[in-house]
C-alpha cells in the first residue's frame, strides 16, 4: 500500500510540473503575397512555441476585431510546444492598419503585433 501511495504521489508531482511549464508565443504577422494596394491578399498571424495550449488570437483592422477569420488546428512540435495559423482575406491600401492581438497566460496584457507591409 505504501508503495502505491509513493508512486501515485510521484505521478501527481510529474503532472503538476508539466502544467507549470510556460512558454510565451512567438507572433509573426505577414501577408501571403507581397503587399500591392487594391489587390486581394491573405493576412496571416502565425503563433508558435507556446505552452500551455490555451490562447486567444484576433486579427485586427484599424484596432477592431475582424470577424471572418479562419485558423488551422492546434498542433504541437517535437518539444511539445504548440502552434497555430490564423488567416483572413484582405485588400491592403495606404490608410488601413492591420495587426494580430494575442492573449496568453504568459502575457500580463494582450500583445499586439502590427503587420509590416514591407516584410
Swiss-Prot record:
Residues 1-20 form the signal peptide. Its main location: secreted. The keyword Signal applies. It comes from the Eukaryota. SMART domains: IGc1. GO terms for cellular component: extracellular region; MHC class I protein complex. The keyword Signal applies. CDD domains: IgC1_beta2m. It is found in: Secreted. Disulfide bonds join 45-100. Pfam families: C1-set (PF07654). GO terms for biological process: antigen processing and presentation of peptide antigen via MHC class I; immune response. Heterodimer of an alpha chain and a beta chain. Beta-2-microglobulin is the beta-chain of major histocompatibility complex class I molecules. Component of the class I major histocompatibility complex (MHC). Involved in the presentation of peptide antigens to the immune system. This is Beta-2-microglobulin. It comes from Leontocebus fuscicollis (Brown-mantled tamarin). The lineage of its organism: Eukaryota, Metazoa, Chordata, Craniata, Vertebrata. The gene is B2M.
